Amino acid sequence: DGITPMYALRPLVEHNMADSVACEINDRIYCEPGDRMGKVAAGIWPWKCKDALFRYNEVTDTRLNQDGMAYDADSGDGTVYESNYSRQNEGGCVMFCLQEAIHNTFRDNISYDDLGGTISPSENPDALLQDNVYYVRRGVPFVRKNMDGGSFTQVNDRVVELDFAPDK
């Protein structure tokens, strides 16, 4: 993980960059103990926080693992991501992780060529996506497959298709 505040009340995370997170999450580096219950990482995200605010951050080139997205509202209440930028993260732009992540807002952000699926609502009850611009490569789904069971509301979001196909 790049930056992860935990169990915090109103943490403010701004003006940061996370680049190439999770490059070392593999069996060669993490070999003991054998079963680690998944090797997961995201760029910048909170764990069990209340009213976390993430703004003016940039996350690029996060490697695919079970997560691999730039941003992740995970098991907290009231997480806000605003005015952030993400580019070419193999797990997508943002995940709203499961039923404990409530009252999340993702607004005024730019996602450019994030891969695997731009958003992952993952059984989330109530994410709000507002005034974002997503530049999505042709062939990449907007909602990530197998992480699509939650609900979200979009208000004034723009999805712009990039004019090139995925590398083969």
Predicted regions and their residues:
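Right-handed parallel beta-helix
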Residues: 1-2, 7-34, 40-45, 50-63, ...
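Intrinsically disordered, low-complexity regulatory regions of eukaryotic regulatory proteins
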Residues: 70-72, 146
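Extracellular glycoside hydrolase catalytic/binding regions
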Residues: 94-96
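Repeat-solenoid scaffold signature
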Residues: 100-101, 123-124, 147
